[in-house]
Amino acid sequence: MAKAEYGDIIYTKHNLYRHYGIYINENCVVHYDGKLDDMFLRKMCIRETTMDRFLGGKTCYYIDNREAKFNNEEVVERARECIGEEKFNLVSHNCEHFAMWCKAGEPRSKQVYLTLLLAITINSCLNNKGVVQNKMDI
């Protein structure tokens, strides 16, 4: 398997989500980082941390992003310019949004999109079931 390079988007898998960052080197990554006791994600801040802190004992993966708008130097520069930023929002400004903005110039989150799509689909199925049951009762 190929290795991540300077400026690549990397991620690690957690139970319900993936955590994204920008790879600097084998011991350094820029990403949204928080305090371990902050279960409500109120203290998330973009930091440059060790790879061990980013991974938290998990496996590292990287994205071969062919949609890159910026070269690797520019990606790292953009990431480092955001260090200290505390604008984290799970739906509109999360770690995946940050990484995609650094690399592709557009804050996007496939995780958020798929979660919203799933919620809409479930809601639609539940509503359709109710409509069918009501029609049968008439």
Task: Set out the residue ranges of the language-model regions.
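Activation targets extended, charge/polar-rich intrinsically disordered C-terminal tails
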Residues: E73-I138
